[in-house]
């Protein structure tokens, strides 16, 4: 062994001590110490701390480190979490109420739910690099349209309760009688759905009337009705005549329907419903103690422009081929702001994809067989119970029976508990039992034994079960498109999933530098526990003694988030950032009401705010008043003072984002909070940019009263291609009593009502990801992540500022965790739009940064802390090469209309075609940078025509020829 190698070996041996080697922060943070030094040199700085001192105002800096547990290792944290998970008890839950155990096909679980190629993608704003999940979502929409018997469906909502509340708001928005303020809700709807609807109705002045649909006297004061199908107690009811009655008085009818039941039962469309809502949870999604699950929303074509959520449509690309895209985006909050159809931004794309694939894998016959088997088991169970003298209160049912057990209730429940089985308990002494896809002969025998019935020949009875009564039977076909007929072997299914995955750019391909989106690492260790049955197989309404592990997770995570935000209380219930905004504003509203100041209804919002802010304010019943920004992008203090003073008597709140949406730490943020407080208002902080705060400052330190967090941004829950997300809110002490509660479960807020989500803790199973992330990083790791996110953003800004002006900087010339590049001059000098640069980046293998927000004609870049120096440099090189292409257009070297920017992105089919008529070579089109020879991402379609797609709206699967 030579002396150099001996010395190196000796040095390595000396370095290795007793400390664990699988520490996580060095795996999560991209730049190492040497790369950090290089980046600081580029910035002309000597240390990261010097950068932070220059970028973050001294007056808002925390005085001490975060009080969090010491960082754990990856191996140790999974051991600890297994111990916590073991404190949950996984019972067979036949509770129902909209949540059901199901069998998740392994090919779908492993290759979608557990696959970063699917779960690390972003919302499909860049259609050309999102064709895979767009096709899966189009399948989802087709599935919903077919099963509900309606004409158009969106690409998912947050859950069934939210979908029902959105249906109420659509009905309210399109009502012909402006004086109609009443909304009828059947008492047979799921309790949690009623709770969410009532929460939504109150700020809007809508009167919710809950009652019996058979006896309610409808009149012109009602603008809508909501029905459950089958009913929460299991009854199957044909609502045709009632829906006609509602139409006679001008009311819009909504049916909350079970998708699996619709494979056997008459559809809402056949009954005349205007809207159908529900959950796709039983189509392959784990219970997860409440979520995440994909809600659905279908309606008639005439209401398409009022429909909430994302809508996938078919258009054509630059080559005349079919291309999918997000359609009718002018409905969304980014454009219509407080007049938007909804505030929903993040939906449940990953879960909608899984549910659609469940339908693709089983096909119509497979789904019908699953439903028929459940129905037969339920029928046998009901018949045997009747013969044994028990009273079944619902004559017609699909999967749920309600039993009048009289004095035997408690002993039945005790026997069920001894077999680790959960039933639904009603306050009037009835027992509800809902069967599902997982039920087998042994389960049914156990159920009968609980009722002291033994030695029943179930298999013989199975043969004799009659079909669904003809009056309720579905007569129409569904899922007739070839995609639902073609992939029923695992081999074919695997290849179909892989084909679609290959069409999408995710974090497995390259960095996704979207400003205000924080597309950081979603580490494998963080993702592991999501599919553990100890967490995934628990019903959201399971008794508290079965969910002690979850209780530990919630309490610890809430405590950690309180420490990070500087607040006194946290609610994990909101299922998205937009829902967190809504919940936070409702807390402010309830606070004012508790002080007899319900007249405070004005919400000040800076003109630069994200579109969800005004949309959420409108949902919470506030009047939006816009505050100007100064030339530096900061809130105009004089305008704020004037408007706060003008509305001193009715000021409810101010909504601000920090750091600002312009990518800087505003120096006057504490003064801004003081101005609002002095006028009696509360300060709501949008937590979209929390990745620049953790460990350095906090909403509480700054002076905010409430802030939502995006766990799918700052705290590592993946974006899932457009959801799931989690948007918990932190609040100051005086707002803690006004956090969202739940009608069925004590979720530790002390409130019985005011739920914003159907489940008590929202998407409970994925908050585990954030728990693991914080536990792995510890105080120092989290703070260093924040520092590095700011360093990476400033490095990119510095490298690109000579050719792309950085629009806004702080007073010392630095940005926060993101920067805005000004591309507007190129439109005049070369005819190049910001969209051309965004699409050209695809040819370089990158997802474009955020386009034209908050300033039209700009790109907002957020690299996060997870990207290495090599990746940052590769992105910068791509941007610099694109700048050279713009110069070539300016000089005439490239044609003004026929150039690589205008024709981007270039597909493999385009550059390998026999015909090439462009005024630049194929190689420049496809391989504009040297590194692309090693690894090239090919977009599946050319530039998609947005205008054509909206003018020729098609939102369900195309004929099979279009896929050939």
UniProtKB/Swiss-Prot annotation:
It comes from the Bacteria. Pfam families: GcvP2_C (PF21478), GDC-P (PF02347). One of its GO terms (cellular component) is cytosol. SUPFAM superfamilies: PLP-dependent transferases. Its EC number is 1.4.4.2. Residues 1-21 are annotated as: Disordered. GO terms for molecular function: glycine binding; glycine dehydrogenase (decarboxylating) activity; pyridoxal phosphate binding. Residues 1-11 have a biased composition (Polar residues). Transmembrane segments: none annotated. Disulfide bonds: none annotated. Its cofactor is pyridoxal 5'-phosphate. The keyword Oxidoreductase applies. It catalyses: N(6)-[(R)-lipoyl]-L-lysyl-[glycine-cleavage complex H protein] + glycine + H(+) = N(6)-[(R)-S(8)-aminomethyldihydrolipoyl]-L-lysyl-[glycine-cleavage complex H protein] + CO2. It is an enzyme of class 1 (oxidoreductase). GO terms for biological process: glycine decarboxylation via glycine cleavage system. Keywords: Oxidoreductase, Pyridoxal phosphate. The keyword Oxidoreductase applies. The glycine cleavage system is composed of four proteins: P, T, L and H. The glycine cleavage system catalyzes the degradation of glycine. The P protein binds the alpha-amino group of glycine through its pyridoxal phosphate cofactor; CO(2) is released and the remaining methylamine moiety is then transferred to the lipoamide cofactor of the H protein. Belongs to the GcvP family. NCBIfam families: gcvP, PRK04366.1. This is Glycine dehydrogenase (decarboxylating). It comes from Leptospira interrogans serogroup Icterohaemorrhagiae serovar copenhageni (strain Fiocruz L1-130).
């Amino acid at each position: 062994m030579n002396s150099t190698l001996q010395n190196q070996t000796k040095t390595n041996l000396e370095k290795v001590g007793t400390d664990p080697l699988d520490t996580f922060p060095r795996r999560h943070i991209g730049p190492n110490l040497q790369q950090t030094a290089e980046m600081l040199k580029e910035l002309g700085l000597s240390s990261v701390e010097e950068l932070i001192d220059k970028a973050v105002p001294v007056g808002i800096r925390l005085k001490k480190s975060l009080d969090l547990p010491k960082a754990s290792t990856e191996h140790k944290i999974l051991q600890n979490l297994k111990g916590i998970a073991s404190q949950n008890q996984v019972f067979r839950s036949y509770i129902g109420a909209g949540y059901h155990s199901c069998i998740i096909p392994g090919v779908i679980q492993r290759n979608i739910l557990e696959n970063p190629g699917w779960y690390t993608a972003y919302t499909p704003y860049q259609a050309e690099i999102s064709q895979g999940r767009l096709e899966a979502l189009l399948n989802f929409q087709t599935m919903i349209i077919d099963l509900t018997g309606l004409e158009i469906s969106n690409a998912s909502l947050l859950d069934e309760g939210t979908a029902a509340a959105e249906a109420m708001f659509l009905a309210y928005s399109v009502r012909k009688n402006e004086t109609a303020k009443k909304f009828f809700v059947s008492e047979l709807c799921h309790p949690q759905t009623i709770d969410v609807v009532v929460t939504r109705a109150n700020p809007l002045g809508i009167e919710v009337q809950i009652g019996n649909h058979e006896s309610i006297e409808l009149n012109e004061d009602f603008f809508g009705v909501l029905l459950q199908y089958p009913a929460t107690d299991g009854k199957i009811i044909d609502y045709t005549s009632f829906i006609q009655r509602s139409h006679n008085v001008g009311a819009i009818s909504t049916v909350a329907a079970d998708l699996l039941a619709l494979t056997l039962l008459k559809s809402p469309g056949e009954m005349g419903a205007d809207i159908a809502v529900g959950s796709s949870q039983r189509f392959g999604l784990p219970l997860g103690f409440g979520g995440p699950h994909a809600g659905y929303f279908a309606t008639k074509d005439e209401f398409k422009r009022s429909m909430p959520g994302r809508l996938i449509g078919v258009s054509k690309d630059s080559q005349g081929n079919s291309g999918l895209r997000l359609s009718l985006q002018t409905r969304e909050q980014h454009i219509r702001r407080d007049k938007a159809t909804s505030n929903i931004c993040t939906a449940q794309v990953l879960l909608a994809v899984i549910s659609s694939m469940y339908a693709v894998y089983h096909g119509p016959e497979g789904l019908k067989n699953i439903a028929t088997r459940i129905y037969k088991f339920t029928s046998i169970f009901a018949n045997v119970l009747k013969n044994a003298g028990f009273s079944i209160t619902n004559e017609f049912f699909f999967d749920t029976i309600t039993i009048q057990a009289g004095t035997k209730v408690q002993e039945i429940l005790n026997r069920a508990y001894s077999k680790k089985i959960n039933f639904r308990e009603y306050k009037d002494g009835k027992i509800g039992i809902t069967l599902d896809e997982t039920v087998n002969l042994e389960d049914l025998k156990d159920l009968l034994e609980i009722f002291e019935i033994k030695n029943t020949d179930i298999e013989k009875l199975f043969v004799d079960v009659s079909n669904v009564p003809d009056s309720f039977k579905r007569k129409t076909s569904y899922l007739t498109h070839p995609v639902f007929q073609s992939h029923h072997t695992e081999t074919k299914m695997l290849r179909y999933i892989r084909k679609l995955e290959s069409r999408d750019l995710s974090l497995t391909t390259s960095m996704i530098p979207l400003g205000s989106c924080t597309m950081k690492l979603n580490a494998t260790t963080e993702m592991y526990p999501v599919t553990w049955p100890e967490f995934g197989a628990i019903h959201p309404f399971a008794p508290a003694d079965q969910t002690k592990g979850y209780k530990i997770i919630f309490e610890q995570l809430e405590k950690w988030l309180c420490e990070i935000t500087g607040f006194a209380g946290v609610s994990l219930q909101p299922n998205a950032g937009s829902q967190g905004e809504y919940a936070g504003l409702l807390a402010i509203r309830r606070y004012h009401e508790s002080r007899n100041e319900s007249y405070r209804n004005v919400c000040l919002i800076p003109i630069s705010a994200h579109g969800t802010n005004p949309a959420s304010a409108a949902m919470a019943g506030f009047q939006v008043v816009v505050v100007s920004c100064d030339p530096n992008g900061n809130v105009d203090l004089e305008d704020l003072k004037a408007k706060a003073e003008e509305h001193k008597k009715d000021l409810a709140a101010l909504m601000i984002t920090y750091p600002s949406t312009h990518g800087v730490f505003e120096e006057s943020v504490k003064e801004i909070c003081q101005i609002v407080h002095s006028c009696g208002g509360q300060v709501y902080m949008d937590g979209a940019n929390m990745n620049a705060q953790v460990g350095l400052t906090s909403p509480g330190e700054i002076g905010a009263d409430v802030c939502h967090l995006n766990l799918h941004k700052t705290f590592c829950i993946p974006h899932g291609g457009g959801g799931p997300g989690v948007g918990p809110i932190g609040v100051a002490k005086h707002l803690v009593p006004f956090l969202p509660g739940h009608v069925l479960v004590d979720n530790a807020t002390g409130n019985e009502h005011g739920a914003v989500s159907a489940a008590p803790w929202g998407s409970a199973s994925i908050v585990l990801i954030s728990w693991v992330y914080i536990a792995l990083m510890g105080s120092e790791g989290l703070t260093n992540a924040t520092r590095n996110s700011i360093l990476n953003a400033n490095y990119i800004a510095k490298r690109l500022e000579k050719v792309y002006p950085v629009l806004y900087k702080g007073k010392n010339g630095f940005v926060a965790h993101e920067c805005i590049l000004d591309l507007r001059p190129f439109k005049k000098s070369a005819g190049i739009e910001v969209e051309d640069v965004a699409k050209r980046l695809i040819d370089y293998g990158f997802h474009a940064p955020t386009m034209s927000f908050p300033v039209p004609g700009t790109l907002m870049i957020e690299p996060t802390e997870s990207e290495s120096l090599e990746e940052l440099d590769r992105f910068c090189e791509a941007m610099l090469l694109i700048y050279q292409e713009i110069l070539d257009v300016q000089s005439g070297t490239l044609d003004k209309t026929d150039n690589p920017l205008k024709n981007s992105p270039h597909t493999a089919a385009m550059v390998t075609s026999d015909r090439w008529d462009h005024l630049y070579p194929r190689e420049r089109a496809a391989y504009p940078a040297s590194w692309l020879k090693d690894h090239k991402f090919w977009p599946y379609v050319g530039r998609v025509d947005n205008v054509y797609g909206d003018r020729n709206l098609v939102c369900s699967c195309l004929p099979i020829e279009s896929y050939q």
